[in-house]
């Protein structure tokens, strides 16, 4: 949690905060993000153990991708298309799935004029390299519901 609260609706032209106090990822009306607080816990258990114990399995983590594109980008907090392409392709390869196999992508989707186009272009490049099909995969971001939960943003996306 942000304590003491030192942020709010503090829009400045050219910044990452929303002009109207709403977060609209991948939307032409999106003008930035809104920060919020949150917490999330994801309990992980090996699939074989969960099945053995009769647990309800909500999801399976089949693969991961992790990288840092360092100085080859606009700023420390701004991703590059090339770095995003590499990490998305890495995650698909690690999971053993093709982009065409997916029906939903939960994106970071901050609704910023810098971040969303980079993320969308990277996804488009990876998907287009695999298939010419269109309209089979939905793109979303939990930030449209709860804003950018800062340190809990990754957990919120996984939980969604």
Report the location of each language-model feature.
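Condensing-enzyme catalytic core of the thiolase-fold
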Residues: 1-160
């Amino acid at each position: 949690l942000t304590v003491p609260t030192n942020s709010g609706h503090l829009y400045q032209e050219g910044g990452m905060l929303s002009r109207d106090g709403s977060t609209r990822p991948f939307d032409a009306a999106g003008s930035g993000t809104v920060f919020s607080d949150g917490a999330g816990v994801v309990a992980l258990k090996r699939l074989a153990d969960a099945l053995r114990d009769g647990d309800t399995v909500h999801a399976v983590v089949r693969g991961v991708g992790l990288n840092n594109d360092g100085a080859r980008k606009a700023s420390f907090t701004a991703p590059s298309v090339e770095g995003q392409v590499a990490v998305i392709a890495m995650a698909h390869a690690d999971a053993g799935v093709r982009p065409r196999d997916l029906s939903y992508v939960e994106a970071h989707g901050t609704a910023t004029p810098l971040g969303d186009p980079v993320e969308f272009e990277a996804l488009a490049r990876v998907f287009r390299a695999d298939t010419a099909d269109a309209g089979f995969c939905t793109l979303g971001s939990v930030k449209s519901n709860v804003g950018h939960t800062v340190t809990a943003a990754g957990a919120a996306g996984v939980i969604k």
